[in-house]
């Protein structure tokens, strides 16, 4: 067994498995034989003592097949109607398939707004925790029938990354239609080589990911690598693996080197800071100077008004805001203690002048370090890791 894989697998108790539409479907709609084979493997893992949580695509594809639609659906109402028809059928298939192994399933449909609200986020965590305690296979999907752009996850790769944080998974496996991440697009280059191990998601790794989505899903390799970036930032290893390969899940847990393994960051975010960084949508931007950049990235300090050189947006107190350097590179995201109009008045000033300018001083910091999540490590930290 590869040393990195052995180290990863020996600590795994709870695994999140994401299955894409391209894996679940064939030429004639849902591939029932493949679904049963995947379920057989997940059931085997469950009986071995692993806690298995699923994020599944396939509702729209299932609905299209039920209706005999072979062309792409273009309008949102059409996609939502197809999802309404297909989701029930998809769950029935999963329920029957897991039932053959004496296992029950529980359905959870989510939109982004369910996770950005901290109370609902924690309620979802409690529900999933209870399902796992009861030995129920939680099956999660985006609620396509009601989701609009403002509350969509974008794709289920992103949804899976967020669920990994909620359940505090020990491993995420993303089953896709390709063998893993290549150093270049294999569809256009004969010299493309599979990358078996990624220690850090660099710009070169991001560039290697294809921008193209699949014919039946919304997420391409770029989406999967971005999800890997989020998951590994929380300290969770991430594997992109060929979902159509026989016994792929069992082979992974037996230590076989399948797909691409992304190692977790050594210095990772807490659950709450992960929620701030990757679940909340930014309401504005604060541009900061070199001194503030160093204080945040290398010293773990709060953001003070003296380090701010620019403000974008019309946010209010408590909103999530992205901190960028002078070149516009995102560095951190945090919850602000002052509104955008107030920050414009006090940016560049010392803390001692806040009350003089605003007439009040509720906080010394624009963003306290407890509410500030670093999303880009300093070069010193990367080299140390």
Swiss-Prot record:
Catalytic activity reported: L-glutamate + ATP = L-glutamyl 5-phosphate + ADP
Pfam families recorded: AA_kinase, PUA
One example of a Gene Ontology biological process annotation: L-proline biosynthetic process
The keyword Amino-acid biosynthesis appears for this protein: yes
Top-tier EC class: transferase
Binding residues annotated for ATP, in chain numbering: 18, 218-224
Residue ranges constituting the PUA domain according to the UniProt record: 283-361
GO annotation, cellular component aspect: cytosol
Protein name as annotated: Glutamate 5-kinase
């Amino acid at each position: 067994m590869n040393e990195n894989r052995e180290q990863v697998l020996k600590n795994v108790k709870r695994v999140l498995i994401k299955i894409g539409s391209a894996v679940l479907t064939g030429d004639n709609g849902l591939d029932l034989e493949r679904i049963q084979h995947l379920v057989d493997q997940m059931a085997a893992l469950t009986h071995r003592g692993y806690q298995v949580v699923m994020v599944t695509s396939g509702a729209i594809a299932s609905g299209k097949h039920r209706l005999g639609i072979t062309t792409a659906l273009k309008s949102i109402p059409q996609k939502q109607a197809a999802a309404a028809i297909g989701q029930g059928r998809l769950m029935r298939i999963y329920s029957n398939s897991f039932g053959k192994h004496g296992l029950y399933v529980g359905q959870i449909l989510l939109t982004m707004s369910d996770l950005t609200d901290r109370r609902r986020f924690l309620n979802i965590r409690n529900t999933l925790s209870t399902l796992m305690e009861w030995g129920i296979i939680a099956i999660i999907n985006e609620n396509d029938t009601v989701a609009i752009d403002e509350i969509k996850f974008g794709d289920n790769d992103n949804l899976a990354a967020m669920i990994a944080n909620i359940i505090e998974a020990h491993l995420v496996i993303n089953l896709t239609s390709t063998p893993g991440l290549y150093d270049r697009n294999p569809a256009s280059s004969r010299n493309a080589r599979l990358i078996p191990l990624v220690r850090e998601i660099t710009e070169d790794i991001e560039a290697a990911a294809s921008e193209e989505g699949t014919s039946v899903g919304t997420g391409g390799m770029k989406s999967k690598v971005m999800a890997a970036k989020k998951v590994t930032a929380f300290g969770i290893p991430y594997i992109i693996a060929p979902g159509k390969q026989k016994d792929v899940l069992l082979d992974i847990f037996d230590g076989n080197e399948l797909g691409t393994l992304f190692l977790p960051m050594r210095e990772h975010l807490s659950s709450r800071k992960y929620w701030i960084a990757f679940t909340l949508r930014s309401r504005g931007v604060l541009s900061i100077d070199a001194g503030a950049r160093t204080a945040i990235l290398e010293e773990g300090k709060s953001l003070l008004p003296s380090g701010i050189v620019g403000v974008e947006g019309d946010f209010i107190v408590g909103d999530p805001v992205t901190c960028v350097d002078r070149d516009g590179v995102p560095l951190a995201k945090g919850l602000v203690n002052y509104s955008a109009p107030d920050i414009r008045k006090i940016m560049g000033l010392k803390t001692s002048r806040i009350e003089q300018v605003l007439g009040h001083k509720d906080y010394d910091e624009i963003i306290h370090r407890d509410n500030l999540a670093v999303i880009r490590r300093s070069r010193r930290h990367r080299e140390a890791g």
